């Protein structure tokens, strides 16, 4: 049974997951003397950042959500919350302030949930197959562009041991160097379902504007025959063939 994470542990796990995603630790500038934790989301994710703000405000001194540049909203936790900030710096930063991934003992389903909601995606596309009916392909991806390759590979190994979910590194060539930019579960529905099993218990706590990230467009196949996985649909694809989350019509494939 998955551990139930709640209270202050849920909040601190949300903050850690956000720092792996769209959150940041701002170093002091001007008259400021202490770093602080801040959160940023797109304007259409306003309910989501309000939710994060309300959680943080229950335990930490937090400023109001405000409009920022490039169609975003943001807020920060007071720099006076030194114990929290120092703890998060220790978990997510090297001494030179470059990013590091937390130890696997610090990773739990709530950390994974907010990391995925911030920096993850689940794309569903039509795959053409020769002499056979086309099918749905799924790719779950979490961006990791600011981390060392060795740290990412170690994280993949540790995550596999802890949760029996095997991410694959995805590389891109950047300025002539091959670099890991994300980890993914590519066209492996069983692994994607195991990932969803981890985070789904918390879905109803999350604003509806983010529920599309839980939608796997599941329908029974010869290999996957259970009806249970249809709970991971945030659309009525089983009856209509249409994924309203992605505004795509897959009826000709089903």
Model segments located where?
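Internal intein/HINT superfamily modules and their associated LAGLIDADG
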Residues: 1-254
């Amino acid at each position: 049974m998955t551990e139930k994470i709640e209270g202050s542990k849920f909040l601190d796990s949300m903050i850690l997951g956000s720092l792996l995603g769209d959150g940041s630790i701002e170093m002091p500038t001007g008259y400021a003397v202490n770093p602080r934790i801040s959160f940023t989301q797109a304007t259409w994710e306003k309910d989501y950042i309000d939710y994060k703000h309300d959680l943080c405000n229950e335990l930490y001194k937090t400023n109001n959500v405000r409009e920022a540049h490039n169609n975003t909203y943001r807020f920060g936790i007071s720099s006076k919350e030194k114990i929290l900030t120092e703890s998060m710096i220790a978990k997510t930063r090297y001494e030179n302030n470059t990013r590091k991934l937390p130890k696997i003992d610090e990773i739990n389903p709530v950390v994974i949930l907010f990391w995925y909601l911030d920096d993850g995606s689940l794309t569903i596309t039509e795959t053409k197959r020769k002499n056979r009916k086309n099918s749905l392909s799924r790719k779950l991806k979490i961006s990791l562009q600011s981390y060392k390759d060795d740290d990412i590979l170690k994280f993949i190994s540790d995550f596999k041991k802890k949760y029996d979910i095997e991410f694959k590194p995805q590389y891109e060539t950047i300025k002539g160097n091959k670099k890991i930019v994300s980890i993914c579960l590519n066209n492996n529905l069983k692994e994607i379902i195991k990932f969803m099993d981890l985070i789904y218990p918390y879905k109803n706590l999350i604003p509806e504007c983010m529920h599309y990230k839980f939608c796997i467009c599941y329908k029974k196949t010869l290999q996957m025959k259970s009806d249970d996985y249809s709970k991971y649909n945030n659309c009525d694809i089983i009856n209509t063939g249409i994924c309203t989350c992605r505004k795509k019509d897959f009826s000709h494939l089903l």
